[in-house]
Amino acid sequence: MPRPYKCRRISEIPKVAYYKPAGIPLSMLEENQLSTEEAEALRLKDLLGLEQAQAALQMNISRPTFQRMLYSARYKVADALLNGKALRIEGGVFEIDARPCCQRQTPPCQPDPPEQT
């Protein structure tokens, strides 16, 4: 019997959910679909620079699952960029983390104030 599916945790829904090459009508484009969880994995690892173990903990998944999700997301983004495809971010099984960002496993919300000299 397979393990039950764990609900993944994300910090927020992406502000923009669709990207396409400029100057090409939508009707002529192929499309890659990136799940909301895959977008969150990219954000945590590539944008915030978290280690995979930290990012997996924040998303409430195992490190190997995070690694597979990150690989899939990077493949889809690279394919869309290099082959002129549209990229849609939607879908998945997730919950939005309601904790304030300073209580999560990520860097603090605000940068440290500059030191006075």
Swiss-Prot record:
Which Gene3D superfamilies does the record match to this protein?
Answer: Winged helix-like DNA-binding domain superfamily/Winged helix DNA-binding domain
- Report the record's disulfide bonds: none
Family annotation (Pfam families): DUF134 (PF02001)
Q: Which PANTHER family does UniProt cross-reference here?
A: PTHR37478, UPF0251 PROTEIN TK0562
- Which family does this protein fall into? Belongs to the UPF0251 family.
HAMAP family named among the record's database cross-references? UPF0251 (MF_00674)
The name this protein goes by in its record: UPF0251 protein cbdbA217
